[in-house]
């Protein structure tokens, strides 16, 4: 018993926790059924097509306003006021939804064409021609009917059944459908109409007098009238101009004339009577007779349209208790006219009536008055001396925000100008991460000046009241009025007497507080209406007759009871079944009995449907004669030319081959260019081919190959789409490997159910709520994928080729002629070369980039070819003549060049043979060279089930050339190559033994700790690659991915113990794997395989055999004669010539457009306009969003126009934008790194590369923290800094992780044209307090001194406190006769890109130099997670790592990091010279050195966005390093110098002289014009538009050397 109780309790707990699978499955099933029911209910909503083009926001407005409809937005028709026009159809359908179907309905002023299209034969439209525009509108409706009928006729169709009755009615008796009388005079007489009569008035009651409306309705015996009209509550406030923002329309009123018009477009206006509309809005009762009245009730307001209904009321039905005896005053006074005294009694008797009374009240809410206040504005006319005072509604929050802020101003700062400036600035909106951090107050800009004056006067009065209160109302000799004028006179200054006189004369200002009173308005206004009628008779309330409907329901209920015995009968839709039976005139009971008998095999009758659905059951017993009327007639038609769009519309994507019995002639192709947009929202079924193995190809072999290639794209596209559909159908059941390739987005929750590894997929497959699957072109916004309302899920694939396959299919199908591809007559030459034979080098030597084209399979190969071709500095290889195969096909016809003389295809045998044939034909070349390797990996057909016969894999060529000498492979690999190739393979490599293997105990043994990576890591399979990447290895690729690449050392890894088909003795993958290295290859494997046997055989290869494959390649030498003079620069004094215009011309040529930028008020514009920002976690004090006003000193104005900006004022917005663009914009590029071990290896490389061997160990006898080191540090500090340390006892450490943040007021100039398109962010400074700097400053100063003393100064320059002359001395021994590669590493966001790895490298360097462990750990923690506080701007945030720009180690730390970064990537043992300074570097290597992919390594290891440039001359720290045959000269960048001459921050003439002296110090070398020619070349290397600049260099020397002349470059700003 105890066991049973325990088991029961355990099972119950499992169920509660969700561990009971049975309960979970039931819950999921219940959730699924609920979702299906909900979606089915949505599908049953009326469907409305919205054809007009509207924006996404307007789409949302329409959808939310009318949830009763299922709206489909086609966006196919541009029109005026498209939203309002499109809403008309929704409004009409909403009104018609209120009316029982089939009841006689009068549409007052309606659109009879709309009712015809909907098949409403029970609607009569009263459409009077009140003006010419009405006639035009009626003719337009007739045109729409004619257009509809002509379309049907052109398509060979007839009017559908549901429209037939309405169209017949209009054709035979048009006056029954529409008349042209007013509703009050309509003569339409219904024929045998039973039931109630209804009316609708869609935007038409404006023109019907309100007093006649009730009588007109009663005349037509209307039971209920539904109306819709545009209105705004603000019209009740007697506003003369009211906006309807949602439909972009407006009302304007002039007296009783009310005009309605649409804004931002040229359309006709509508004029109505304001008083008449007001009656419809405010009245409740509309009398129709002495007995009946129509009562109005508002229903809803949707998109600026008010809906109401007028219900017919019989006053005789009123409860008798409301009747009372009273005197009819009109009858009384009429009788009194006849007799006053004698007939008084008779008059009283005659005037007695029984009256019925009722009353109503309507509240109108004014939403715009909520949180608003009424503010007075003052104005005066100078011509008429007439003063005016008006009141406006302004946001309460806005008013008191302004008043509270300016109330804090000091007396001198409280001026009208400062108040106006603040009001302008806070009107703009600040959005942080999509959330409004500072609200935007919708205040009319034209009111800001008047409001500012009111706020200013209000504050002045408040200041006075405070003074009076403080003095306890003791005013002395001055009156209250005099106090006010004293305050105003302080603000207006000398202008006060005239101002005071004018204000007094006009009585503009009153001292009393009520003149400046700010009041709160009412939110509601109530309108009353009263009904008085005479009691004459009494009747009973009639009941509604629903007997007929109940009888029909009983029949349907009995029929469904019969059907309930069938399987899946619970899924029958009763509404659909009843409608089908009614429309087909089938008895439901009979249909049900026959179906049950047939399904139970009791009737001996077989019906034609497969499943008993609602429609099939009704169709089963439809009358044969009526069924034949709607039968589908199959007719023969001519064979069409199939297009992409047509194919998908028919549910198929055609093949180029012959499938089944289809004739070949049916597969032709038209010449139109089809867009990829045609694929958007195509059904997935239209792209999936389920059977492709029976395709037959005809024609020559090349044609067959080309057709097969087209079909392979179709098959690939089909497989990709099919896989995504499968993922959508079974998201939860896919395995881990599949999860790594796909992604599934749940649209409702905006979350990834399966997160993809890649981002920004161009295409995907969409699952709708109706469980339909479509291929969709994906778009993105700040929230991710842009989705539609009917989307349920979106699937994407990292391996998906949907986009490229679609683009290539579009191109290739366009090239077909009558369904046949065109074969080029060009000569095709196959260049068959062994691995490493120099195929790419040969291509570069043979190609003429002006007339030839190079195509490669991969993007990296294309970039490599361009890089190698442009290595000389001259750009010859571009994206126009070096392309990938996919790019060439996808963008065919878009390039300026369409014909090439010769075509070079690198690794062409990796492509489909049909693809190669297409490339030759598309290039229109005379001869095509296909470079490849017949023994390496060929084209692989990756679509299972797609036929790719063996004879298709052989490329048809005219000639074959062989290359059998490898420049890469060592001797042992060359021995293996001789087994695989025909002919004798030779090698130029000096390496004899290169391959080895190691059997490992299991896959877990392979990790970065026990098996650190050596060289390039390769795998055979993608799964092994992903496993290695997950364990911490970087830069891992498969063998197939690196075909054609070369590496010094290779580590080949196999983790899969199961058999792998591509690892075989004759496998091309094995050949590629063995031939990638130049020095060594080591194979790590968990099992014995054929590759192990091959490597073991090669390990045993004798030296005698390896020497047989060697080819000696000698080196040619040339006799060199050194210059006679070395070590000193030739000096030629530069002549002082030129003018200001020379500098301006040179600047405009180098940076075109920069000088035209009017950026003086950019900062003001940003502060006064709306701004939307996205930030990381931070705390903002919005009270600091507007800085306190300061006195502005006008700076000197430069005569040279550059992109220099005015100094910025610090504040929340400026500081926050700077922080976003810098501190919050750190890249995340790095891969998985073993930080400690990798940092240790990097530091080893750093010490080995830069430090002298004898000084690589720290001197432990020297104390870092001593009195001498502190004194040396203090000597470099300013007195202010030392004063801050006066109260510091050095006993305890302050918070090392706390930093302050500030910005430099002057933006940094960039020597590019980015200023024309972006707002430059200010440079941020993050710094410690001086107390922390006093502790660590001396330490790092001493560490820096020791580091610089240990550096090999003959080869490396760490630019710290060096002069230009010292730089020239360092580079002076460069030999210009020795070919050199000058390298520069350009890194963007250098400081902010530094992360934990950089910190680890830097700390390890300091540790090895002798940094004490405890302080080192403190310093490390102070740079890990740090807090930034900006007290000026009111910002507080937290950042991880990053270089602190105001730290004691900022400069030397950056210099050390850039040096360590380069040492880890480049062969520093070969370097000639190297210089490092902050994030700048300049390296000189011997010509021809091979360098790794620096950009790739910098991204993955160092998190740097880096580019490595090869140049002729170096550029270092803003200076050009010009090496020549006598030494080296360093020129300051002349363009940078000119940019500084446009500075806008020079305060006065003394400041200008200091500025000139600093420029003279840095530009002294320009006095030597001996090397101006080389300087021109160096500048042109950076700025391609720069002209020869000797004229401007001389002009700079002229102005910099003359103090008086230099002053002419600026003018006094205060005088302007």
From Swiss-Prot:
Q: Which Gene3D superfamilies match?
A: 3.30.450.420, P-loop containing nucleotide triphosphate hydrolases
One of the entry's Gene Ontology molecular-function terms is:
RNA-directed RNA polymerase activity
What are the start and end residues of every segment in region (Helicase)?
Answer: 830-1085
Location of the region described as Methyltransferase in the Swiss-Prot/TrEMBL record: 50-458
SUPFAM superfamilies linked? DNA/RNA polymerases (SSF56672), P-loop containing nucleoside triphosphate hydrolases (SSF52540)
Q: Where is the RdRp catalytic domain?
A: 1380-1493
- Give all residue intervals belonging to the Alphavirus-like MT domain: 72-281
Fill in the subunit field for this protein.
Heterodimer of a large and a small subunit.
**Full protein name:** Replicase large subunit
Q: Origin organism of this chain?
A: Tobacco mosaic virus (strain B935A) (TMV)
């Amino acid at each position: 018993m105890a066991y049973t109780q325990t088991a029961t309790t355990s099972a119950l707990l499992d169920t509660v926790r969700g561990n009971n699978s049975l309960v979970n499955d039931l819950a999921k099933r219940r959730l699924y059924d609920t979702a299906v029911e909900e979606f089915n209910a949505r599908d049953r909503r009326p469907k409305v097509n919205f054809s007009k083009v509207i924006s996404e926001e307007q789409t949302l407005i329409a959808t939310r306003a009318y949830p009763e409809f299922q709206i489909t937005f086609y966006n196919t028709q541009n029109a005026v006021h498209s939203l309002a026009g499109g809403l008309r159809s929704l409004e009409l359908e909403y009104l018609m939804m209120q009316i029982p179907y089939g009841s006689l309905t009068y549409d007052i002023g309606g659109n009879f064409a709309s009712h015809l299209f909907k098949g409403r034969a029970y609607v009569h439209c009263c459409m009077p021609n009140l003006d010419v525009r009405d006639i035009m509108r009626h003719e337009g409706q007739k045109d729409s009917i004619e257009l509809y009928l002509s379309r049907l006729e052109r398509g060979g169709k007839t009017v559908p059944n549901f429209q037939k009755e309405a169209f017949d009615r209009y054709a035979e008796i048009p006056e029954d459908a529409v008349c042209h009388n007013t509703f009050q005079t309509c003569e339409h007489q219904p024929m045998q109409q039973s039931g109630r009569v209804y009316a609708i008035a869609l935007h038409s009651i404006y023109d019907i007098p309100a007093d006649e409306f009730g009588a007109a309705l009663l005349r037509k015996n209307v039971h209920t009238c539904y109306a819709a009209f545009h209105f705004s509550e603000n019209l009740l406030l007697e506003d003369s101009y009211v906006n309807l923002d949602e439909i972009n329309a407006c009302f304007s009123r002039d007296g009783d004339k009310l005009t309605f018009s649409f804004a931002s477009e040229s359309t006709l206006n509508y004029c109505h009577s304001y008083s008449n509309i007001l009656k419809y809005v405010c009245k409740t009762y509309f009398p129709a007779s002495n007995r009946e009245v129509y009562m109005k009730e508002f229903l809803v307001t949707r998109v600026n349209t008010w809906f109401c209904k007028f219900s017919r009321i019989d006053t005789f039905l009123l409860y008798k208790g409301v009747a009372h005896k009273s005197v009819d005053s009109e009858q009384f006074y009429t009788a009194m006219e006849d007799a006053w005294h004698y007939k008084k009694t008779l008059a009283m008797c005659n005037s007695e009536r029984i009256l019925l009374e009722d009353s109503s009240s309507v509240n109108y809410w004014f939403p715009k008055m909520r949180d608003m206040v009424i503010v007075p504005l003052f104005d005066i006319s100078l011509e008429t001396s007439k003063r005016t005072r008006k009141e406006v509604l302004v946001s309460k929050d806005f008013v008191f925000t302004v008043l509270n802020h300016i109330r804090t101003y000091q007396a001198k700062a409280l001026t009208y100008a400062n108040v106006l400036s603040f009001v302008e600035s806070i009107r703009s909106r600040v959005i942080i991460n999509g959330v409004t951090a500072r609200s935007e107050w919708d205040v009319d800009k034209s009111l800001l000046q008047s409001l500012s004056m009111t706020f200013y006067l209000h504050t002045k009065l408040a200041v006075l009241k405070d003074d009076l209160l403080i003095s306890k109302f003791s005013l002395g000799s001055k009156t209250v009025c005099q106090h006010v004028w004293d305050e105003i006179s302080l603000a207006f200054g000398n202008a006060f007497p005239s101002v005071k006189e004018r204000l007094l004369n006009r009585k503009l200002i009153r001292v009393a507080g009520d003149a400046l009173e700010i009041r709160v308005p009412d939110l509601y206004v109530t309108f009353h209406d009263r009904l008085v009628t005479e009691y004459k008779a009494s009747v009973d309330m009639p009941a509604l007759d629903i007997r007929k409907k109940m009888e029909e329901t009983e029949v349907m209920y009995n029929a469904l009871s019969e059907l309930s015995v069938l399987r899946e009968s619970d899924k029958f839709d009763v509404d659909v079944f009843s409608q089908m039976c009614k429309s087909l005139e089938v008895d439901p009971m009979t249909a049900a009995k026959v179906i049950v008998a047939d399904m139970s095999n009791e009737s001996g009758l077989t019906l034609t449907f497969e499943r008993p659905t609602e429609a099939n059951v009704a169709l089963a017993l439809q009358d044969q004669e009526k069924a034949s009327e709607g039968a589908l007639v199959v007719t023969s038609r001519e064979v069409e030319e199939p297009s992409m769009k047509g194919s998908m519309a028919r549910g198929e994507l055609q093949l180029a081959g012959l499938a089944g019995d289809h004739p070949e002639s049916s597969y032709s192709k038209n010449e139109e260019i089809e867009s990829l947009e045609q694929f958007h929202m195509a059904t997935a079924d239209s792209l999936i081919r389920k059977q492709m193995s029976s395709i037959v190809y005809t024609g020559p072999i090349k044609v067959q190959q080309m057709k097969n290639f087209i079909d392979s794209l179709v098959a690939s596209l089909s497989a990709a789409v099919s896989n995504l559909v499968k993922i959508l159908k079974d998201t939860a059941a896919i395995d881990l490997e599949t999860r790594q390739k796909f992604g599934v987005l749940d649209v409702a929750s905006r979350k990834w159910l399966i997160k993809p590894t890649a981002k920004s997929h161009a295409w995907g497959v969409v699952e709708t709520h109706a469980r339909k699957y479509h291929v969709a072109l994906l778009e993105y916004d700040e929230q991710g994928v842009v989705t539609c309302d009917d989307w349920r899920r979106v699937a994407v694939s990292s391996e998906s080729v949907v986009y490229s396959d679609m683009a290539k299919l579009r191109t290739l199908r366009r090239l077909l002629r009558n369904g046949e591809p065109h074969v080029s007559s060009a000569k095709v030459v196959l260049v068959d070369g062994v691995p490493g034979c120099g195929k790419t080098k040969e291509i570069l030597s043979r190609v003429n980039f002006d007339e030839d084209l190079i195509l490669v399979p991969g993007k990296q190969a294309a970039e490599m070819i361009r890089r190698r071709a442009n290595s000389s500095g001259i750009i010859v290889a571009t994206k126009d003549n070096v392309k990938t195969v996919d790019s060439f096909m996808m963008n065919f016809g878009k390039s300026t060049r369409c014909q090439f003389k010769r075509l070079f295809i690198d690794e062409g045998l990796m492509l489909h043979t049909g693809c190669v044939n297409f490339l030759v034909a598309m290039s229109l070349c005379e001869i095509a060279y296909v470079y490849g390797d017949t023994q390496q990996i060929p084209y692989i057909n990756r679509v299972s089930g797609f036929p790719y016969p063996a004879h298709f894999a052989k490329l048809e060529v005219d000639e074959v050339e062989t290359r059998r000498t490898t420049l890469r492979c060592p001797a042992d690999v060359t021995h293996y190559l001789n087994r695989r190739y025909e002919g004798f393979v030779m090698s130029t490599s000096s390496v004899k033994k290169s391959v080895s293997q190691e059997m490992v105990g299991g896959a877990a043994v392979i990790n970065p700790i026990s098996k650190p990576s050596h060289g390039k890591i390769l795998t055979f399979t993608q799964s092994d690659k992903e496993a290695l990447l997950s364990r911490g290895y970087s830069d891992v690729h498969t063998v197939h991915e690196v075909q054609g690449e070369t590496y010094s050392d290779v580590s080949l890894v196999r983790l899969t113990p199961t058999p792998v088909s591509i690892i075989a003795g004759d496998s091309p993958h094995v050949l590629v794997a063995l031939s990638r290295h130049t020095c060594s290859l080591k194979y790590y494997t968990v099992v014995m395989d054929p590759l192990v046997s091959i490597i073991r055989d090669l390990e045993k290869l004798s030296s005698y055999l390896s020497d047989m494959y060697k080819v000696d390649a000698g080196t040619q030498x040339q006799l060199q004669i050194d210059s006679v003079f070395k070590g000193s620069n030739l000096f030629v004094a530069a002549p002082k010539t030129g003018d200001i215009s020379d500098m301006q011309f040179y600047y405009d040529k180098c940076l075109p457009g920069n000088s035209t930028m009017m950026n003086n008020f950019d900062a003001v514009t940003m502060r006064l306009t709306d701004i939307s920002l996205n930030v990381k976690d931070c705390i903002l004090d919005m009270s600091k969003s507007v800085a306190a006003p300061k006195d502005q000193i006008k700076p000197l104005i430069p005569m040279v126009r550059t992109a220099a900006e005015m100094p910025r004022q610090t504040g929340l917005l400026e500081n926050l934008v700077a922080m976003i663009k810098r501190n919050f914009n750190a890249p995340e590029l790095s891969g998985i790194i073993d930080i400690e071990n990798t940092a240790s290896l990097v530091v080893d490389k750093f010490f080995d590369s830069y430090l002298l061997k004898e000084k690589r160990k720290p001197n432990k006898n020297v104390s870092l923290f001593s009195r001498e080191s502190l004194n040396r540090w203090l000597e470099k500090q300013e007195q202010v800094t030392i004063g801050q340390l006066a109260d510091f006892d050095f006993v305890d450490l302050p918070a090392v992780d706390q930093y302050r943040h500030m910005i430099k007021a002057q933006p940094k100039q960039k020597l590019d044209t980015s200023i024309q398109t972006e707002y430059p962010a200010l440079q941020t400074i993050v710094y410690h307090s001086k107390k922390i700097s006093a502790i660590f400053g001396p330490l790092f100063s001493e560490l820096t001194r020791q580091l610089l003393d240990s550096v090999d100064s003959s080869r490396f320059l760490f630019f710290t406190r060096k002069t230009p002359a010292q730089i020239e001395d360092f580079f002076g021994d460069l030999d210009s006769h020795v070919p050199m590669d000058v390298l520069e590493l350009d890194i963007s966001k250098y400081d902010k890109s530094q992360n934990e790895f950089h910190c680890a490298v830097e700390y390890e360097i300091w540790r090895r130099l002798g940094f004490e462990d405890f302080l080192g750990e403190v310093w490390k923690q102070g740079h890990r997670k740090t807090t930034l506080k900006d007290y000026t701007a009111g910002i507080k945030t937290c950042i991880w790592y990053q270089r602190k720009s105001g730290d004691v180690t900022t400069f030397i730390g950056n210099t050390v990091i850039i040096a360590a970064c380069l040492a880890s990537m480049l062969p520093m043992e070969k370097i000639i010279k190297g210089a490092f300074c902050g994030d700048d570097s300049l390296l000189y290597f011997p010509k021809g050195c091979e360098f790794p992919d620096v950009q790739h390594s910098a991204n993955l290891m160092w998190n740097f966005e880096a580019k490595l440039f090869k140049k002729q001359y170096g550029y270092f720290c803003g200076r050009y390093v010009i090496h020549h045959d006598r030494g080296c000269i360093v020129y300051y960048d002349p363009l940078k110098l000119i940019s500084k001459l446009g500075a806008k921050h020079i305060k006065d003439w003394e400041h200008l002289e200091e500025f000139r002296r600093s420029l003279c110090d840095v530009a002294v070398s320009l006095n030597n014009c001996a090397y101006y020619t080389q300087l021109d070349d160096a500048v042109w290397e950076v700025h391609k538009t720069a002209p020869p600049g000797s004229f401007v260099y001389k002009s700079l020397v002229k102005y910099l050397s003359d103090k008086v002349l230099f002053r002419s470059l600026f003018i006094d700003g205060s005088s302007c």
